[in-house]
Every structure is written in structure tokens, then in C-alpha cells.
């Protein structure tokens, strides 16, 4: 986990520095480079307290925009402290003012969702534009969503698709997901389930968890072609395996409802175990009360027939997956 977090931060800082150097008129202070290096070394070793203090010194004393953005990540991801979205947004906004494109995008999200200020789609659009113009093309998709929904602007679904399409075409999985959602759930004037499926399939090739989930939903509701339950189940299970929480219940339900063994009239051992695994994960992670209630009801049915000797191993697998 620590290595993953460090790799993420390194990638973000590398990209941010590269783009910041290209933005005319931006003067990010390079002072305190030793403090920044110390902070990065501390974060790489998992010493969150030391890393935070070093970044804080660079952010406050040196007004270093990269350090300010890094502090935002600490509060956003809960690195060595409680997750605090509002404080994360305040640091992102400082870094955005210093010219960091990814911080400008994050600041747009903060204003769009009303995290540290009241919702303000116009201000959100301002930051999305700045980030996009600096090369963070995915920001165009967030700007597109404002046009698709008519929040702060007149609705323009065609323009929304035009804005998001280049980032999706260039291979951004988040942008591809946006395109899929626009075609599936956007303004009725541009909805196209076939196009939605195509974009989700492209994102799924890059192992985007949400893409598998939406493919399952489309296959589930596709009246033009009857998909086998096994095909649909595979989509939800793949999303669940990649820790996409909404997929836990769907995967568990499909295993629970699978065809029983014709000789015994019972679920196969594999289907029984997987139904227990995913439905249990749903009861731990889902935020939907009805979903949790349904999962618990199915679990009672499973526990009535599943050997008790399986429980310890299966519960251990659930705990490992949810870590």
C-alpha cells in the first residue's frame, strides 16, 4: 500500500512539474528543494508524520505549490491522519493558484461538489478550463458534465460530447467512463446504449472497475439481445474483484441465483462460496440499506446449507479483500 501511494504521488508530482514549467507566467518557487526531497524520502519510507511536516514547511514558508498539492493528498487519502475533504480542497486551491494543472482539476471538483465552499458550477468550470488548457484533458469531461446537466450553464449535450471525446479517444479510462455514462444516462437527445457499451468496453480493456459494472448493467437490461446470466455475472464479478463496491451485491446475487446442480438441486460449491463472499462484502461496504437487507436475507439462506467448516477460510478471504 505504501509503495502504491508513493508511486502515485511521484507520478502526480512529475506530471505537475512538467506542465507547470510549460505554463507561461507561472513562477513556482524551487526554493526548499532539500525540504521537498526529505519529504519525498520520508513518504517513500512510510514516515507520514515527518513527510507531512516537511511538506508543510515547504508549503507555508516557501509557498511551494507542489508541496501544497501534496498536503491536499494527505488529507484526501488519509495518509497518517483522518480523511478531511474540506482541508484537502483548501490545499488544492492554494496549489491551483500556483499553476499546478492537477490541483486546478481537483479544485474544480471541490467547487463542483461543494466540499469546502457552497456548490459553484461557474467557479468549478473556471478551474476545469484552466486545467484542461494546461494539458489536463480529462478536465474537459467534468466541464462537459456541467453542460450535459445544465448546472450553471445552458444545456448543450452535443457540445458536452465534443469536449470529452478527445481525452477518451487518447486513452484516458476516466474520460472513457464519462463518455459511456453520457451515452447511457445523459440527456435523452444523445442517449445511445450501443455507444455507451462501446466506451465501457474500451475502458474495461484497461481494467477500469466501474466499466465492468456498467457493462453488466447494460447486458442485464438489453432487450435487443438476451445475454446469458453467466456473461452478466462475469462482468459484475470482475468489477467486484477490482473492489468496485456497487458490484458486490450484484455479483453475490447472481451467484446466489445461479442454476443449481441438476443432481443435487443445490448450488455448486464454487457458486455457494462466491455468493457468500460477495454478499458478505456488500453487507460490509454498501451504503444502500435495501441492498444490505437483501444481502443479509440471502446470506441466511446460504448459511443454512453451507458447511460451517468453510466459514473461517471464507471470512479470512473477505477480510483480506477489503483491506
Regions inferred by a protein language model and the residue ranges of each:
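TPR/TPR-like (Sel1-like) alpha-helical repeat modules
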Residues: 198, 267-290, 319
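Structural signature of tandem alpha-helical TPR/SEL1-like repeats
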Residues: 45-53, 82-91, 118-127, 154-163, ...
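Bacterial N-terminal signal peptides
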Residues: 7-14
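Canonical positions in the second alpha-helix
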Residues: 57-58, 94-95, 130-131, 166-167, ...
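N-terminal leader/linker segments that initiate helical-solenoid repeat arrays
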Residues: 15-54, 60-61, 66-70
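Short helix-capping/linker turns of helical repeat alpha-solenoids
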Residues: 30-31, 35, 47, 61-64, ...
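Hydrophobic face of amphipathic alpha-helices that form TPR/SEL1-like repeat modules
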Residues: 35-42, 54, 70-77, 106-113, ...
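Terminal, low-structured helical/coil segments at or just beyond the last alpha-helical repeat
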Residues: 23-28, 284-323
Amino acid at each position: 500500500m505504501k509503495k502504491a501511494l508513493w508511486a502515485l504521488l511521484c507520478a502526480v508530482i512529475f506530471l505537475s512539474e512538467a506542465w507547470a514549467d510549460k505554463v507561461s507566467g507561472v513562477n513556482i518557487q524551487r526554493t526548499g528543494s532539500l525540504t521537498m526531497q526529505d519529504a519525498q524520502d520520508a513518504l517513500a519510507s512510510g514516515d507520514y508524520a515527518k513527510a507531512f511536516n516537511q511538506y508543510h514547511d515547504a508549503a507555508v514558508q516557501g509557498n511551494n505549490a507542489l508541496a501544497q498539492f501534496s498536503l491536499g493528498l494527505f488529507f484526501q487519502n488519509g495518509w497518517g491522519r483522518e480523511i478531511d475533504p474540506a482541508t484537502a480542497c483548501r490545499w488544492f486551491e492554494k496549489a491551483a493558484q500556483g499553476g499546478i494543472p492537477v490541483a486546478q482539476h481537483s479544485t474544480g471538483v471541490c467547487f463542483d461538489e461543494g466540499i469546502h465552499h457552497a456548490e459553484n458550477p461557474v467557479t468549478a468550470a473556471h478551474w476545469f478550463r484552466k486545467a484542461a488548457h494546461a494539458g489536463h484533458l480529462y478536465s474537459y469531461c467534468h466541464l462537459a458534465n456541467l453542460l450535459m446537466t445544465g448546472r450553471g450553464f445552458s444545456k448543450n449535450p452535443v457540445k458536452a460530447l465534443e469536449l470529452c471525446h478527445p481525452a477518451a479517444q487518447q486513452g484516458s479510462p476516466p474520460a472513457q467512463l464519462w463518455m459511456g455514462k453520457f451515452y447511457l444516462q445523459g440527456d435523452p437527445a444523445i442517449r445511445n446504449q450501443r455507444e455507451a457499451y462501446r466506451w465501457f468496453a474500451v475502458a474495461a480493456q484497461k481494467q477500469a472497475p466501474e466499466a465492468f459494472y456498467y457493462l453488466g448493467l447494460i447486458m442485464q437490461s438489453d432487450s435487443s439481445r438476451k445475454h446469458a446470466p453467466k456473461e452478466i455475472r462475469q462482468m459484475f464479478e470482475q468489477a467486484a474483484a477490482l473492489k468496485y463496491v456497487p458490484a458486490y451485491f450484484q455479483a453475490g446475487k447472481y451467484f446466489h441465483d445461479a442454476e443449481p446442480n441438476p443432481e443435487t438441486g443445490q448450488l455448486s460449491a464454487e457458486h455457494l462460496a462466491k455468493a457468500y463472499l460477495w454478499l458478505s462484502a456488500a453487507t460490509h461496504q454498501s451504503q444502500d440499506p435495501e441492498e444490505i437487507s437483501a444481502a443479509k436475507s440471502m446470506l441466511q439462506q446460504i448459511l443454512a446449507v453451507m458447511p460451517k467448516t468453510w466459514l473461517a477460510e471464507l471470512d479470512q478471504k473477505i477480510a483480506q479483500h477489503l483491506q
